[in-house]
């Protein structure tokens, strides 16, 4: 059983982090080393369908901080933890709002690439146009010859000089093959092959 005073400390730490009064480094340093804090917050996380065991996740990072999607997941969990305990707070951290702002616009085959979120934000941070407009803009940036890739892990679509290369084709498809090659072409016609293990 967790003492109320201990939970109060956890809630205060979470509020400081989500409101931008504590850096990710500071929060991660406290959070990743406190098994009771992890367990208490993990209970809230389990109530959500996106649940991913935090202790396993932390162990898999081997002391490293999470990447963009891990940070989004962490911030959503912290936010839900505060909501569950009726703690008023403002979401000042940047990753969670950025993800939620653009996630429904980004096509599935690009949704695993955090760079796409930042590209959209740089293109129009005020989100003044329709979702269709942004979707068309993404298609202009991430071109493909005949068909789009089925899906790619994280930031594997090559971008050179700020411009994504044109996708040509892939060998195999996710969930059917353990090894997939994605073929791209530069403007000068030279080819780039990205190897991915499913």
Where are these regions (language model features)?
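Long compositionally biased, domain-poor regions of proteins
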Residues: 2-198
């Amino acid at each position: 059983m967790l003492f109320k005073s201990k939970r109060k400390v956890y809630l205060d730490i979470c509020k400081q982090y989500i409101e931008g009064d504590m850096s990710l480094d500071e929060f991660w340093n406290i959070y990743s080393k406190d098994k009771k804090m992890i367990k208490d917050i993990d209970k809230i996380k389990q109530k959500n369908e996106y649940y991913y065991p935090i202790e396993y996740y932390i162990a898999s990072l081997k002391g490293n901080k999470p990447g963009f999607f891990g940070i989004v997941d962490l911030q959503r969990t912290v936010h839900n933890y505060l909501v569950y305990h009726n703690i008023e707070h403002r979401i000042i951290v940047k990753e969670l709002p950025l993800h939620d702002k653009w996630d429904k616009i980004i096509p599935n085959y690009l949704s695993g690439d955090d760079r796409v979120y930042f590209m959209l934000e740089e293109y129009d941070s005020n989100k003044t146009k329709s979702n269709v407009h942004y979707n068309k803009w993404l298609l202009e940036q991430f071109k493909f010859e005949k068909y789009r890739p089925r899906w790619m892990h994280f930031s594997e679509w090559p971008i050179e000089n700020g411009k994504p290369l044109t996708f040509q084709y892939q060998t195999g498809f996710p969930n059917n093959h353990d090894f997939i090659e994605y073929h791209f072409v530069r403007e000068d016609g030279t080819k780039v092959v990205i190897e991915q293990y499913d």
